[in-house]
A protein has these predicted regions:
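S-adenosyl-L-methionine
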Residues: 1, 15, 148, 315, ...
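Short glycine-centered segments of the SAM/dcSAM-binding site in methyltransferase folds
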Residues: 147, 321-323
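SAM-dependent nucleic-acid methyltransferase catalytic core
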Residues: 94-255, 262
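Conserved phosphoryl-transfer catalytic core
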Residues: 13-121, 128, 132-135, 280-293
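Conserved S-adenosyl-L-methionine
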Residues: 1-43, 182-231, 254-283, 321, ...
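SAM-dependent methyltransferase catalytic-core segment centered on the flexible catalytic loop
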Residues: 230-255, 260-320
């Protein structure tokens, strides 16, 4: 059994969709219907034809000027100045790109940049997103509608107009071909969601089928709320009486969480596209240690207080001999203070390397798993 708490409504939706029960035939049927509508929409535009021509032009150009493995070897040996050479070749390819854009009448930018969806998506992609979203609205089954909404959100997260090197930390929207330091060649932004939509529909269905076979007869639910003040059992009672009775009788064995670290991430902003599209209410002001507040002395104090309040609130719902595991790269050494504030002691620390990072920065990075327990009076 598990209870999650998240201040972000969208994150709670993701969590709940992972464990929800579905009519998988209905999910497959609706995916097929929407994919057909998307392909029909694309057949009436020149987007795919444009992309095909562009990919061929890029293939020829990159083979000539960024041959594998010669280019990467020369770059490593310092025989090529990557910044100068990359910028020069980026400029050389631009006329080819612009000619194709004109030929196929591709609209690179939207008319306004008011919202995240306006700014970070080309007009073609925005039109496709709106089409799929309109089709999702027609779905009758609520569970099916939710999981396909998540598939669309995964798709649009992968289709933002950014360079491959800046996927994790958006810098400026990209509307043309560019030299890509991550791949060592000229790359392009996306002009259609079709590829990623296809990837994520297949991936999600495979995960749902697999999880259905592994599922146990247990309860899981992710609540939307502020962990510092939420009445966990009261909120569960509103949604599932059986689960609430079980939780109140047995209490909670422990916590496993990876809280955002101070000044590292704006939690709601990382999913701004979903808040724009689905209209969820944002609660940015309730975030603990957001990026926009920085890492100054006041921010650290506020973070320590916030995490301490979470632990003190949640303790009320735990068994006496609880175990808490918190994951953090605690470079400011705040967790010993947090543990003390919550009447806990750190009984063990586990070091964990962080692999498979999205960004170009692949530097060594490790986190600590803090194992905390109630301070013993003996």
């Amino acid at each position: 059994h598990a209870i999650g708490i998240d201040v972000s409504a969208f994150n709670a939706l993701i969590g709940n969709c992972k464990v929800m029960k579905y009519g998988l035939v209905d999910v497959q049927t609706e995916i097929s219907r929407i994919t057909k509508a998307l392909k029909e929409f694309l057949a009436n535009s020149h987007t795919l034809e444009f992309e095909e021509k562009l990919l061929q032009a890029l293939y020829d150009f990159n083979n000539k000027y960024f041959p594998v493995p010669d280019y990467k070897y020369k770059r490593k040996q310092g025989e090529i100045n990557e910044d100068e050479y990359g910028t020069e070749k980026e400029k050389d390819f631009l006329p080819i790109f612009n000619k194709l854009v004109k030929e196929y009448n591709i609209k690179l930018r939207q008319d306004k940049t008011d919202t995240f969806l306006d700014k970070w998506y080309s007009q073609n992609i925005r039109d496709e997103i709106q089409l799929v979203f309109a089709e999702i609205k027609k779905i009758k089954n609520i569970a099916t509608k939710k999981i396909i909404s998540i598939i669309l959100s995964r798709t649009i997260r992968s289709c933002r107009a950014t360079t491959h090197a800046d996927l994790a930390t958006l810098v400026e929207p990209i509307t043309a071909t560019y030299y890509c330091s991550k791949h060592g060649k000229i790359c392009k932004p996306l002009f259609s969601i079709l590829k990623w939509w296809g990837t994520y529909t297949k991936d999600t269905l495979a995960r749902l089928y697999q999880f259905d076979k592994l599922r146990t007869q247990t309860f899981q639910f992710c609540l939307t709320g502020d962990s510092r003040t939420i009445d966990i059992f009261g909120e569960i009672e509103k949604r599932n009486l059986l689960f609430a009775e079980l939780a109140q009788r047995q209490k909670i064995k422990g916590i496993f969480s990876s809280p955002p670290y101070v000044g590292l991430i704006d939690y709601h902003e990382q999913h701004a596209y979903a808040y724009d599209l689905y209209g969820f209410e944002r609660k940015d002001e309730l975030e603990i240690g957001p990026l926009y507040k920085g890492q100054g002395r006041e921010s650290k104090q506020s973070y320590i207080q916030g995490i301490s309040e979470v632990l003190n609130n949640c303790k009320k719902y735990l068994v006496d001999d609880y175990d808490i595991f918190l994951v953090a790269n605690d470079k400011y050494n705040m967790y010993p203070i947090i543990a003390e504030n919550a009447g806990m002691q750190i009984v063990k620390q586990y070091k964990r390397p962080v692999l498979n990072r999205t960004e170009k920065d692949k530097g060594a990075y490790s986190e600590t798993i803090f194992h905390m327990r109630e301070v013993s009076n003996g």
